Amino acid sequence: ENRPIPEPGPNEVLLRMHSVGICGSDVHYWQHGRIGDFVVKDPMVLGHEASGTVIKVGSGVTHLKPGDRVAIEPGVPREMDEFCKTGRYNLSPTIFFCATPPDDGNLCRYYKHSASYCYKLPDNVTFEEGALIEPLSVGIHACKRAGVTLGSKVFVSGSYLVNILRPIGLVNVLVAKMMGAAVVVVTDLSASRLQKAKEVGADFTIQVKDETPQEVASKVEKLLGCMPEITVECTGVQACIQAGIYATRSGGTLVLVGLGPEMVTVPIVNAAVREVDIRGIFRYCNTWPVAIALLASKRINVKPLVTHRFPLEKALEAFETTKRGEGVKVMLKCDPSDQNP
């Protein structure tokens, strides 16, 4: 679809887009036209894992200039409500969010965005790393909510019973290790994804198939020599949530990252009598400056996550590749004059 190049408002910048990662939610909107209560009613531009170059600034923008390379935080509060005042703007019910109906995303040549939510990239951080700040932010927010700290033993639950692509599990491994986790164990159906988990820092991996949740929990405990204090559940699958509860040590924390059906059956009494705290996350907040600092200092390396690259003209092929579950992260290159990472 061809659209006119947008004109930035006083507090906005116009960007020439460079790199946009394909997320599972993009594929879901493409295939099903909705996620929960968010329904696509009009043509919508996808994409929310993105970076680009500033080519024009609004009259009120002073911290950015044309030529600046930036990473885009896709969630922009529309009003200063109670959630914004307490620093949890991700929970604002009126927030703008790229590629969430009815808001357009940034998988396009040119895109305008709030300047306050565009972050300048250091020279040693690539466009692709800038785009990957979005999934990395999910890991940062999840591990902060989980309370990962020095010496933590962490169980990251990936695919189980269903074969789905989960880069989010890998970024949680990266962040947990960076935050000081002593041991991280990962479960998944796929041997190739478990190998990738080892490459990014997982200490142990378990390839699961048709085990019961209790059997998965038992395998985690046997491998670690104890029950983990923290479980990060990345799928939203009922059996995985059950396994997360059974696996987590009494007094520990289970964080739910993956979103599945609205109603699931879980052993809540088992969690209650053992004081296992169950915490949710919704996107992220206040993570872009932290993520940029980690990437610039080389404390975290997200480059291995990108396994496929396509020019924007081959977007359909890129989406089909993601849908088939090939590789880890598929990156679309939106600037025809610069296809570099």
For every predicted segment, state its role.
Residues 49-51, 69, 83, 110, ...:
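Residue-level marker of beta-strand positions
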Residues 146-150, 178-179, 195-277, 316, ...:
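Glycine-rich cofactor phosphate-binding loops and adjacent beta1-alpha1 units
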Residues 5-20, 35-82, 122-124:
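Glycine-rich beta-strand-centered segment in the early N-terminal region that forms part
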Residues 219, 226, 242-246, 285, ...:
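C-terminal hydrophobic helical "lid"/dimerization subdomain
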Residues 125-210:
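Mid-domain Rossmann-like dinucleotide-binding core that forms the NAD(H)/NADP(H) cofactor-binding site
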Residues 39, 78-157:
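NAD(P)H dinucleotide-binding glycine-rich loop of Rossmann-like/cofactor-binding domains
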Residues 189-190, 260, 284:
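Residues in the short beta-alpha loop(s) of Rossmann-like NAD(P)-binding domains
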